[in-house]
Amino acid sequence: MKLDFVNSMVVSLPSSKVLTYGWNFGSMLGMVLGFQILTGTFLAFYYSNDGALAFLSVQYIMYEVNFGWIFRVLHFNGASLFFIFLYLHLFKGLFFMSYRLKKVWVSGIVILLLVMMEAFMGYVLVWAQMSFWASVVITSLLSVIPVWGFAIVTWIWSGFTVSSATLKFFFVLHFLVPWGLLLLVLLHLVFLHETGSTSKLYCHGDYDKVCFYPEYWVKDFLNVVVWFVFIFFSLGYPFLLGDPEMFIESDPMMSPVHIVPEWYFLFAYAILRAIPNKVLGVVSLFASILVLVVFVLVNNYVSVMSKLNKFLVFVFIFVLVVLSWLGQCLVEDPFVFLSMVFSFLYFFVIFLLFLVYYFAGRVFM
């Protein structure tokens, strides 16, 4: 029975005849998730979740633990690798209209939200100047929630400010959430394998598909090349994607001149800063991810609109890249104005993507 289940997942799974490297992203994400859990578990052996010792314990891992620096560098850059493939996987889903598989799409959005929360907590654990103040700013945004906002912030902080108790809370969650992610990923795969993945040829039945093995196995060997590039980058340029403030121990009495999150949060951070009202800014921040759920309302596939869909997806990627650049710029003109413009374009392009297929279903079907 167990062998039949494994066989249905990785051998006889009906797969699209159109073999593209876009299908590597999901398998690569699974590999990186396992890699992050292994390296993170090793780091947890030596990490101290006390506010007075956290930053020093990270330095201890880097300088005193045998090969500790390798694990820390690989885990740090592994988060960036994970988000690169996570966003590529999302873009591929938009490109091939994978949101037609409703349960797969919704479970994927939930995984995205959990991964972003997980990455943020891991960022805070370094307890450096930038990560400490980022935790203060981001968690305090929850205070805009009516009635319960202040109570929620106090509960997360475990007090009236970010402290050692907050660090312990984040450390426990950062250690436990990946195991929940594994279950969600398994559920994501089960939902996917109920129908098979989408195809730009839109193959309707299993009779018009090929087995996962051997073609898709061979295709996945590209992941080996990616791993070699990742290791070379991590060892040659270990902190290129980091911030210099992350090498300074946190000081609650002095904030950095310019608070900037990790690169994979910059687009959402730019949207947050673009809105002058705090409540609307927080709503826009969460909406930037949750708005992707609206695609499950699309119930049709109209091939005459596929070219327009692909064009809009590329426009969406361009807008996302520009927003990420604006997110690390200073809060001054013209960057503030440009953030407003591209924040509007971000939601407008998503609205157009949805609108195209909503009305196409009424006109052509």
Curated annotation (Swiss-Prot):
Gene Ontology cellular component list: mitochondrial inner membrane
Biological process annotations from GO: mitochondrial electron transport, ubiquinol to cytochrome c
Superkingdom of the organism of origin: Eukaryota
Binding site for heme b b566: 89, 188
Protein residues bound to a ubiquinone: 193
Cofactor note: Binds 2 heme b groups non-covalently.
Alphabetical UniProt keywords: Electron transport, Heme, Iron, Membrane, Metal-binding, Mitochondrion, Mitochondrion inner membrane, Respiratory chain, Transmembrane, Transmembrane helix, Transport, Ubiquinone
Bilayer-spanning residue ranges: 25-45, 69-91, 104-124, 170-190, 216-235, 279-299, 311-331, 335-355
CC cofactor: heme b
GO molecular function: metal ion binding; ubiquinol-cytochrome-c reductase activity
Residue numbers binding heme b b562: 75, 174
Topology relative to the membrane: Multi-pass membrane protein
Predominant localisation class: mitochondrion
UniProt-annotated location(s): Mitochondrion inner membrane
PANTHER family membership: CYTOCHROME B
Subunit text: The main subunits of complex b-c1 are: cytochrome b, cytochrome c1 and the Rieske protein.
Task performed by this protein: Component of the ubiquinol-cytochrome c reductase complex (complex III or cytochrome b-c1 complex) that is part of the mitochondrial respiratory chain. The b-c1 complex mediates electron transfer from ubiquinol to cytochrome c. Contributes to the generation of a proton gradient across the mitochondrial membrane that is then used for ATP synthesis.
Any further remark recorded for this protein: Heme 1 (or BL or b562) is low-potential and absorbs at about 562 nm, and heme 2 (or BH or b566) is high-potential and absorbs at about 566 nm.
UniProt record similarity statement: Belongs to the cytochrome b family.
Name recorded for this polypeptide: Cytochrome b
Organism: Ascaris suum
Lineage: Eukaryota, Metazoa, Ecdysozoa, Nematoda, Chromadorea
